[in-house]
Amino acid sequence: MKVDLNSDLGESFGRYKLGLDDEVMKYITSANVACGWHAGDPLVMRKTVRLAKKNNVQVGAHPGYPDLMGFGRRYMKLTPEEARNYILYQIGALYAFVKAEGLELQHVKPHGALYNAMVKEEDLARAVIEGILDFDKRLIVVTLAGSRVVEIAREMGARVAQEGFADRAYNPDGTLVPRSRPGAVIEDKEEIAERVISMVKDGGIRAINGEWIELEVDTICVHGDNPKAVEITAYIRRRLEEEGVKVLPMGDFIK
């Protein structure tokens, strides 16, 4: 049994520091690095890639809407052409630093509102995946487990990693409960670890209303932008390994 642990990193910008990247990087296997549009800048991007290299963590691009003020969490209506080229542009920007450090790019995980919009809008999902495949057909597309995006990406010939969220509540339809709703974000490390183990070993999780939903997950997102992030991430990894789960980069087992 195998699973990848990923985290959204490199989200500082200029003098503004966000996240505990140096510490979280010790416990994950894949890093989603912001590409400068919702967060990150050239200095932060290179620093984050170097940090991943130091910790033997695989690097992926984390492109989002062009929305620094809103941190990429506000919806924007894009044409398919805009979406395809926005993604290609951001992957290319990060890849410059990846190549400079002698690494390979493993995956692409869209950020925030873009990630969520792809689940609802098939045309947007196709355009984003086209942008990813334009760059490199070997890149893994990371998307919400059980969503229509998984089917679309596979139909288009992409490698896909289905993602579960360690600290987020789920709706009965398998989508994430909006952050604005009570109970959307889970903070207790024991509960978080049990939910992760349930997803990985039992193939599902309890929705916010108590319903059982089936989820096939390849990678678990752990957040690195809250005070307990390091403790929770380390605990999740330890618990998984105690359960006999191998924690590996997604590129090692996604076909």
Swiss-Prot record:
<comment type="similarity">
    <text>Belongs to the LamB/PxpA family.</text>
</comment>
<dbReference type="InterPro" id="IPR011330">
    <property type="entry name" value="Glyco_hydro/deAcase_b/a-brl"/>
</dbReference>
<keyword id="KW-0547">Nucleotide-binding</keyword>
<dbReference type="InterPro" id="IPR005501">
    <property type="entry name" value="LamB/YcsF/PxpA-like"/>
</dbReference>
<dbReference type="GO" id="GO:0005524">
    <property type="term" value="F:ATP binding"/>
</dbReference>
<comment type="subunit">
    <text>Forms a complex composed of PxpA, PxpB and PxpC.</text>
</comment>
<dbReference type="Pfam" id="PF03746">
    <property type="entry name" value="LamB_YcsF"/>
</dbReference>
<keyword id="KW-0067">ATP-binding</keyword>
<dbReference type="GO" id="GO:0017168">
    <property type="term" value="F:5-oxoprolinase (ATP-hydrolyzing) activity"/>
</dbReference>
<dbReference type="GO" id="GO:0005975">
    <property type="term" value="P:carbohydrate metabolic process"/>
</dbReference>
<protein>
    <recommendedName>
        <fullName>5-oxoprolinase subunit A</fullName>
        <ecNumber>3.5.2.9</ecNumber>
    </recommendedName>
</protein>
<keyword id="KW-0378">Hydrolase</keyword>
<comment type="function">
    <text>Catalyzes the cleavage of 5-oxoproline to form L-glutamate coupled to the hydrolysis of ATP to ADP and inorganic phosphate.</text>
</comment>
